Amino acid sequence: MEVYLASAAGLLSWCGKWRKIPTPLAHPTLLAACGADVALADSVNRLLYRQGRVSTLPPGVEVLRCWRNQLLTLSSETNCLTLYDAHDYPLVTSPAGIRPCDCAIVDCQVIVCGCEDGCLHIFSLPDLREIAAYPVPGCPMRVAADGGVLTCLSLLSPDPPQTLLFRLCLTSGDFAPVALLPGWCGAVTIADDHTIWAGVGEQLLHFPLDSVVPDVQLGEFGLIRFLSCQQSKLLISDPWAGRCLLMDTSPPYAPRQLYAGECGGCCFASCRKGTLPDWKASLNEP
């Protein structure tokens, strides 16, 4: 199992120990992996690096997603979703909400959190045609997909901050609130057993299937921004606290700190030797 982390130290890979992967981006903030394909972004300087190429991004990119051999970006400044081809040329752009800040892919659809317009927007791929928009309570800010069921975090109130965790069925549009939680929207992901892990405020919470009460509540986080679950492992990036952690999704739920420092996007990846020939791995510790 390999982990990628975008950090102030550059692009880092962890598989028992850290190695630094040199790239032209000195301070990457976002990344996306799909098999052996890794896309890396510096959203501050609007740069994208993928497959040996550097290209320019729109301002305000919040999210990178890989779809087949193509790339999706979501910008909270242009309020647009953009699909790029395999050579990082923009193919099509569609308006998507007001200050949109997250999206998820389900087969040939992409679901966008429209944030300030109060809707979840459903687009078809690859034409980015909007096929549905579901009004939801508050400002939807985070989304994870489990087949045709979406799990979302929506900010109901900023002062004091309150977040609604809910599920929505893509086929029927049925809406099911799960829990009202104190704190800002952080991140949400779905485990292999279809249960929910959510970062809200300073907490990490786990909700079993069909439960509105968390059976795990861990504190002492800053604000978790990225969560990824794979093979009973939970990867956590907490930029506010400046750390990346790995945890088993079974008791005793003890997060292990992998990295301390300024960090951004993280993900699990399976990268075969030789698939990134221009990324010469250094074994120096960050």
Give the location of each predicted region.
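Inter-blade boundary loops/turns of WD-repeat beta-propellers
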Residues: G16, S43, Q51-G52, S76, ...
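An edge-strand/N-cap motif at the start of beta-rich repeat modules
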Residues: M1-L25, T29-A33, P286
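Repeated scaffold domains used in trafficking and secretory/extracellular systems
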Residues: A26-G35, P59-R68, I98-V106, G138-D146, ...
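Conserved beta-strand positions in repeat-built beta-propeller and related beta-rich domains
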Residues: L5-A9, L40-N45, T73-E77, V112-D117, ...
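A short beta-strand motif characteristic of beta-propeller blades
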Residues: K17-T23, G52-L57, D88-P95, R129-P135, ...
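Blade-level signature of beta-propeller repeat domains, shared across WD40, Kelch, NHL, RCC1
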Residues: Q230, S237-P286
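Conserved core beta-strand positions within WD40 beta-propeller blades
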Residues: E2, D37, Q70-L71, Q109-I111, ...
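Structural motif
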Residues: G10-S13, R46-Y49, N79-L83, G118-I122, ...
